[in-house]
Regions:
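Glycine-rich nucleotide-binding loop
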Residues: 89, 100, 123, 145-153, ...
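Short conserved segment of the HATPase_c
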Residues: 101-113, 167
Length: 168
């Protein structure tokens, strides 16, 4: 089901879904991002709580990588990834110490080709993140932090990514 939803959200690689747990998925995601990116200070906090079986797909990982990569581009010295549970949802928050979002960028969040990077094809990362999250019944919120920097929060209902219960 998750693969089908992700395929319809724009994932066309057709890679198989993997059965895992939320904690294992986000721990592996954080470790892979850390090991494949040059980042002086990457803070990772996994406060998800009691683990939950889930189905993961490369699109879920790429969705978070897009946000982390944007944060690294804006704040090459410091990025934080925090994972928590909000009632029946997985909440993934990426924080940076960069200049924050321009007001017009926040107003047009989710519109394709909105980017501060001024390069061809830019501005699709957050657009794809929003589409995948919405397809799964989730949400994406972005804001500028009062102390500086930006924060992007992805919230996905656990029901959309949970493993179906085994039938007795």
């Amino acid at each position: 089901i998750v693969s089908g939803i992700l395929l319809s959200a724009g994932e066309t690689r057709g890679e198989a879904s993997v059965q895992t747990t939320v904690r294992t998925f986000v721990d592996a995601l954080a470790e892979e991002w850390r090991s494949t990116r040059s980042m002086p200070q990457f803070i990772y906090d996994n406060d998800f709580g009691a683990d939950t079986p889930m189905v993961s797909d490369t699109t879920l990982q790429q969705m978070v990588f897009n946000v982390l990569d944007n944060a690294r581009d804006a704040s090459p010295g410091w990025v934080r990834l925090a994972v928590t549970r909000n009632a029946d949802a997985l909440r993934i928050t990426v924080t940076d110490a960069g200049p924050g979002f321009a007001p017009d960028m926040l107003a047009k969040l989710g519109t394709p080709y909105q980017s501060s990077k001024n390069r061809p094809g830019g501005g699709l990362g957050l657009y794809l993140v929003l589409n995948v999250a919405r397809t799964l019944g989730g949400s994406v919120a972005a804001r500028n932090r009062p102390e500086g920097g930006a924060e992007v929060t992805i919230e996905l209902p656990l029901a959309a990514i949970a493993l179906p219960e085994a039938k007795a």
